[in-house]
């Protein structure tokens, strides 16, 4: 087995564990955290470009063990901690290629508009056809009425788009680029992980995973074409605000 393949397998395990492999058993959780820490230490010594991404997914794993993780958006915690380290540790900052806004030309605005419109139509169609059970979401949304909920929706759209783009089209993309190299493979891999991460989101279930995967592919293309995250963040933000408004209508809160 070549060193690159070995590092690719290790990094993939690191990512999947960091995002998905949590248990109600605290012993299992802490043993997993120790294993992830070993992987991070190994990358620090043998493949430094993977050190930063691996470190973030260790932080993500630990954040999921926090008592408030069930509230959602808890990934703000590991992302904020990671950004502080990136800003103050020069070698880590030098390898963080995702911290760029990029350039947005006329063609990108056009494609971004098309992607946004198609995404909104897909969301509305999914909600109308499948009529999902959204009781778990309803229980965490406070109050009712446009005056109360609009600021919450805008804040959610801004924060969630920033966090998810930084993770999937930023940190994860950088790591996958090191171990996979080919743009198409990197894009498909990050979109697949993005899709699986949304299995309990909106849209949800198998169809939700597929829709999120397709959406992730297009956001990845935009990220590559603009060489930065600003355009994907804007597109994602509009989609998230649309999701919030659809949810409010479906939950009869507006």
Model region roles, listed by residue range:
Residues 2, 69-77, 148, 152, ...:
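Membrane-interface starts of transmembrane alpha-helices
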Residues 2-18, 36, 51-61, 113-120, ...:
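Alpha-helical transmembrane segments
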Residues 3-15, 21-43, 158-167:
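Hydrophobic, membrane-facing alpha-helical anchors
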Residues 8, 54, 108-113, 150-154, ...:
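Hydrophobic alpha-helical transmembrane segments
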Residues 19-90:
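Alpha-helical transmembrane segments in multi-pass membrane proteins
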Residues 87-160, 178, 253-254:
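Juxtamembrane helix-loop-helix connectors linking adjacent transmembrane helices
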Residues 103, 162-189, 224-228:
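Membrane-interface helix/loop boundary segments of multi-pass membrane proteins
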Residues 184-197, 201-254:
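Functionally important transmembrane alpha-helices
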């Amino acid at each position: 087995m070549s060193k690159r393949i070995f590092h690719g397998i290790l990094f993939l395990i690191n990512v999947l564990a960091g995002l998905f492999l949590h248990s109600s058993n605290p012993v299992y959780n802490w043993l997993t955290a120790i294993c992830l820490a070993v992987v991070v230490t190994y990358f620090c010594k043998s493949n430094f470009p993977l050190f930063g991404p691996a470190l973030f997914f260790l932080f993500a794993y630990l954040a999921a063990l926090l008592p408030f993780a069930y509230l959602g958006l808890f990934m703000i915690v590991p992302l904020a901690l990671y950004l502080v380290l990136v800003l103050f540790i020069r070698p880590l900052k030098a390898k963080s290629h995702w911290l760029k806004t990029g350039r947005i030309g006329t063609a990108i605005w056009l494609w971004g508009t098309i992607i946004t419109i198609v995404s909104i139509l897909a969301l509305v169609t999914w909600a109308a056809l499948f009529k999902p059970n959204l009781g778990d979401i309803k229980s965490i949304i406070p109050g009712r009425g446009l005056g109360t909920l609009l600021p919450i929706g805008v804040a959610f759209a801004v924060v969630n788009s920033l966090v998810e783009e930084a993770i999937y089209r930023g940190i994860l993309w950088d790591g996958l680029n090191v171990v996979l190299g080919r743009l198409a493979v990197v894009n498909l891999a990050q979109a697949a992980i993005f899709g699986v991460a949304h299995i309990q989101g909106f849209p949800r279930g198998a169809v939700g995973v597929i829709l999120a995967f397709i959406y992730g592919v297009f956001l990845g293309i935009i990220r590559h074409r603009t060489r930065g995250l600003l355009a994907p963040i804007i597109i994602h933000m509009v989609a998230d605000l649309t999701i919030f408004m659809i949810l409010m209508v479906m939950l009869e809160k507006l």
